[in-house]
């Protein structure tokens, strides 16, 4: 996890396989750009683990789609949200970068809003016709959307 005691700490959240791959590429690019002077923490899968991330918990805990699949997992997902917020507050990263999974991350963003930690979301979420307010809702919680 740590390449240097005083190196910037970047906290990443990826909650499904495609986000894990994007996160792994992001870690590699950041490591190259900083000459390896970088610390990484967060939530990710096998690809991010290959880049040195020790995930707070398995992404399979939050990588759930479909109403029938989500309903029985709500208590676990809510617990993982609380654990994520608590760990980020404990770690005091220089930035939090969420990758995809806006449903999980939205509550994390809201929970961290008063903590003065920059929040960036990588991979802009789709704004559907039946949820046109989604972009405004996300913009209110984030510092930057890529």
Question: Each PLM stretch: what is its role?
Answer:
Residues 8-146:
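Active-site and donor-binding regions of nucleotide-sugar-utilizing enzymes
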